[in-house]
Regions:
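Arg/Gly-rich low-complexity intrinsically disordered repeat tracts
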Residues: 5, 11-22
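Conserved non-catalytic scaffold segment of RNase H-like nuclease domains
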Residues: 24-144, 159-169
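Residue-identity detector for glutamine
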Residues: 13-15, 151, 159
Length: 169
């Protein structure tokens, strides 16, 4: 069971892949715990009913070591065309992949003792991941970790003006 999990409403999923953008070596993170930057691709945007079709992460240890992993997941349900159009993953691509239940214990072990981070992760990725753990019957404690939503940081750091948008685009 997932304990003390912060639920959020009205998720919005943004296409984002962290694996293609590793941390710069000159970037110094002062980490107490390892942090896992992760992204999910899913069958849709409903936290309660949609399923993971891909999980990828970059795990950064306090000593600076990094490890990455990408897994395709059979969601055991049809992937709607609209979702496939976003992430490019179709039913045939995951037909022979393991289900989340089959990999849940390994994923839980990979993120054990880690803080979690991602883009829009507090509103979408973390709730979806928690729901998948619940369905798989894997107990994971979400109370002893920090959640870092890069989207929140981005919105605080970037100017939200017409002039800034003009310069950006």
């Amino acid at each position: 069971m997932v304990r003390n999990y912060p639920f959020f409403m009205f998720p919005i999923h943004y296409q984002f892949s962290i694996i293609h953008y590793p941390l710069k070596k000159e970037m110094k993170l002062n980490l107490k715990n390892p942090i896992v930057f992760f992204d999910l691709e899913t069958t849709g945007t409903n936290i309660n009913t949609d399923r993971i079709v891909e999980i990828c992460y970059l795990k950064v240890y306090p000593n600076g070591n990094e490890e990455t992993k990408t897994m395709r997941i059979n969601p055991e349900m049809h992937i709607p065309e609209a979702s496939s159009a976003v992430h490019g993953i179709y039913d045939a691509d995951v037909a022979d992949c393991p289900t989340f239940k089959e990999v849940a214990k390994n994923v839980a072990r990979d993120i054990e003792g880690c803080d979690l981070a991602g883009f829009n992760s507090n509103r979408f990725d973390i709730p979806v991941l928690a729901e998948e753990f619940l369905r798989a019957g894997v107990d994971i404690d979400m109370t002893k970790r920090k959640f870092v939503d890069v989207q929140v940081i981005f919105h605080k750091m970037e100017q939200r003006t017409l002039s800034a948008a003009y310069k950006f685009y």
